[in-house]
């Protein structure tokens, strides 16, 4: 999908949303989901973290999702709120629900221009934090991708 079509799709989704938060804060993170938008927006945990982070005065969370099958572009992955490439954020926080999303996590990072494997990332690239339901069942596979794994 060309970049302008992706931007149009994102703006259409934002126009249909209720409760979108656009904030400016001293600290920002990209709140990422390793599946497409409709799957992420069905996750109460993902929405709760979005509200909790944005409820703080000193933090702002912007959302990013694995593009739909036809939504991948050479331009990478940007956040919905400011259209900032996720590779420009200091931290990427992922909610990973189950093992099948590990492939989506690797694809997301690759499409975003961030090395998927932890040991391949440089110090000037985003810190990758993983949490979500998978951490309760089997957090070990996340270690290949995450700099930090948070239970929950």
Residue ranges of predicted features:
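Glycine-rich beta-alpha loop elements in corrinoid/cobalamin-binding modules
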Residues: 66-152
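Residues at alpha-helix termini
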Residues: 56-57, 112
């Amino acid at each position: 999908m060309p970049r302008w079509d992706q931007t149009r799709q994102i703006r259409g989704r934002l126009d249909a949303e209720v409760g979108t938060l656009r904030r400016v804060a001293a600290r920002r993170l990209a709140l990422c989901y390793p599946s497409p938008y409709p799957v992420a927006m069905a996750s109460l945990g993902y929405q709760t973290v979005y509200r909790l982070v944005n409820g703080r005065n000193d933090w702002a969370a912007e959302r990013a999702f694995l593009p739909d099958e036809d939504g991948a572009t050479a331009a990478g992955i940007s956040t919905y709120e400011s259209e900032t490439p996720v590779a420009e954020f200091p931290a990427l926080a992922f909610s990973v629900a189950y093992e099948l999303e590990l492939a989506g996590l690797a694809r997301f990072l690759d499409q975003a221009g961030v090395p998927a494997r932890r040991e391949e990332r440089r110090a000037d690239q985003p810190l990758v934090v993983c949490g979500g339901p998978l951490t309760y069942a089997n957090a070990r596979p996340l270690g290949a991708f995450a700099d930090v794994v948070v239970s929950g």
